[in-house]
Amino acid sequence: MVSTSKIKSVDFYRKIPRDLTEASLSGAGLSIIAALSMIFLFGMELNNYLAVSTSTSVIVDRSADGDFLRLDFNISFPSLSCEFASVDVSDVLGTNRLNVTKTIRKFSIDSNMRPTGSEFHAGEVLSLINHGDETGEEIVEDSVPLTGRNFDTFTHQFPILVVNFYAPWCYWCNLLKPSWEKAAKQIKERYDPEMDGRVILAKVDCTQEGDLCRRNHIQGYPSIRIFRKGSDLKDDNAHHDHESYYGDRDTESLVKMVVSLVEPIHLEPHNLALEDKSDNSSRTLKKAPSTGGCRVEGYMRVKKVPGNLMVSARSGSHSFDSSQMNMSHVVNHLSFGRRIMPQKFSEFKRLSPYLGLSHDRLDGRSFINQRDLGPNVTIEHYLQIVKTEVVKSNGQALVEAYEYTAHSSVAHSYYLPVAKFHFELSPMQVLITENSKSFSHFITNVCAIIGGVFTVAGILDSILHHSMTLMKKIELGKNF
């Protein structure tokens, strides 16, 4: 049986009676410094243990979300009408989707980007069957040519004024011309302007009356506008826009359209109508809407290959003057991939505090052409997309996000100008992994801090004590 004395012999911490120890002022000072150092270093170690540390690596893209990528956008075009705004998508694999509408919404806006109503619905804009009468007869011009000087007079004089805004070089305008003039003749015979005075058909040459056409926000030719008592303002379910005709363009269809507009209007006695014409026009005159722009928003699924998102004016029955098109725009939002949920985004930022500075790089940026760049200006954006994946310490993928860099430029186009977003995905991805920390490592470091400081302080105290003792002995030797 092992005796108690033998067990005591392995004691590392043998006690010295307090009566045999001696306290000193220098030792007390070192003890205070050592205690403060222990507390400070322990706090630093605890902070380091609680802090999140990550490691970043670049690996080959291992996306698990398939071959398609979600693209969300919200872009405002102050000079492009929703009537003709078209969203197109193409890629290097041959995909070419024109005028995407299923997941796209359009809202008319004014020049200050303010919405002028609810969602824009174009209806059957581009589904014309007849573009005009096929005739070889000589065209007799019966429609009234309008200019900037007499336009307001005619719009106030007639309760219904149907105007064809055209350009002589336009193919569709030339197809419309015979049926338009024949319809004008039939309407003039049916509703005599002098005796009836309810309706008249007119035309405006936009190559000669550019200011007048711009004032009425004419962007495509031909544009058939309907003016009622001096204004073409249409108020439909809080949506304010220009009233236009989108139907067939043969003579019969045009006449039928005009008759449907005139029939609800009560025919006044001729003299009374002439007497009250100016008063009625002043009372019922409405300010023309400043609805010349469009906000296009929505999403689409694009393939993970280099591709293009383009917004331009497009129509199967209109022509456009490229020199008058202005593709200025404001990118309200543009992002790739699924949106990060708010509860995950806070964790996302916690693991990577610097991530997100380049997220949605184009958001809020304006690209305005003040006509100082000349005509036919295409605005291009080159986007390089990199996927970033954040993985927690337990191996769980927290979130997958797509960030991009953006470089923008302008180019003079030989064709119709567009707003073009070229996107290209990197074959590599950034992997951010949370580093796990061992609690045993933390305890080891704390013990090392306490023991190390205590030992170093003891060594310093011993050196200081022996130095002072030696100095006292030297002084005593000198006195003898």
From Swiss-Prot:
Induction: Slightly down-regulated by chemically-induced ER stress response. The keyword Transferase does not apply. It is found in: Membrane. Residues 120-263 form the Thioredoxin domain. The chain crosses the membrane at residues 439-459. One of its GO terms (cellular component) is membrane. Disulfide bonds join 170-173. GO terms for biological process: intracellular transport. Its main location: membrane. The record marks 249 as: Lowers pKa of C-terminal Cys of active site. This is Protein disulfide-isomerase 5-4. Keywords: Disulfide bond, Glycoprotein, Membrane, Redox-active center, Signal, Transmembrane, Transmembrane helix. Belongs to the protein disulfide isomerase family.
